[in-house]
């Protein structure tokens, strides 16, 4: 297929998606910021600073393990974005079937690892002195919840691949209010739930995957239903080759947490008393900046994937300049 320059309407559509995503993220951050302060006050006031520090420590599991999807997210995004008839696309269907199979294996490994570490009593050694009494069991339960929700994450990838990143971002707005409701329920019931706080946080985050899988299911009907039906049919429905796309994404996922997400573990092992709790407070502001730039960048992914599938040439320099300016402006504001 001959390559053609990018179409103006395509570029304007991509930037409109970025704008919607950025505005949605700002709105969600505002809501999350308010409820985040409420949650912090409830946790520290009713469950203590130790519970707050442990919650921040265990909350880093997903950041430390972004490789758990084994690069599948990139495969789904590219395939969905390049489809011309998404509900009936056989390639997308087989890709989703393969993705769910791989994620189920990853979930089983994560769950098994959590249980084994819990039975061996190895969590205090791995996570440091900021782990509360009984925190090992809490860490295991958090991993089990995370593992159970992992296959559902295909819904988020499908939505983003469809160019509806704003929908995925808005769905994350339920996390902080849901956690507030669970914390208030524990307070009203007078439960000594310090160790349960991280589990509540993981359950609240699972709501995002549930919402997105429902939205994706309805928007692509009957695609997801057919793909899920094929998951156990290993011999009748063969998978597709995904290593070419998933491999490079997996390498990035392995490197990034080592560079940026090991800070809390170091503080837990080497920091002074209270340093981890103080760091968690400061990290909330920094995460607002990085998350905004990240989600707006992901919003551009379907645009470039679709252009590549159609043989169009798209320059990334304008987007890179815009994101650099956005990051600098947000940094100055914070």
Protein language model regions, located:
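Alpha-helical transmembrane segments of multi-pass membrane transport and lipid-handling proteins
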Residues: 1-4, 97-127, 141, 185-189, ...
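Interhelical loop/hinge segments that connect adjacent transmembrane helices in multipass membrane
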Residues: 2-18, 195-201, 213-260, 311-312
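Signature of the first transmembrane helix
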Residues: 17-81, 111, 145, 180, ...
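Membrane-interface helix-capping segments at transmembrane helix termini in multi-pass transporters
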Residues: 49-54, 86-97, 111-143, 189-199
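Transmembrane helix-bundle signature of multi-pass secondary active exporters and lipid flippases
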Residues: 55-70, 256, 279-298, 327-331
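Helix-loop junctions and terminal segments of transmembrane helices
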Residues: 70-86, 161, 225, 282, ...
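Membrane-interface junctions at transmembrane-helix termini in multi-pass inner-membrane proteins
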Residues: 147-172, 191, 306
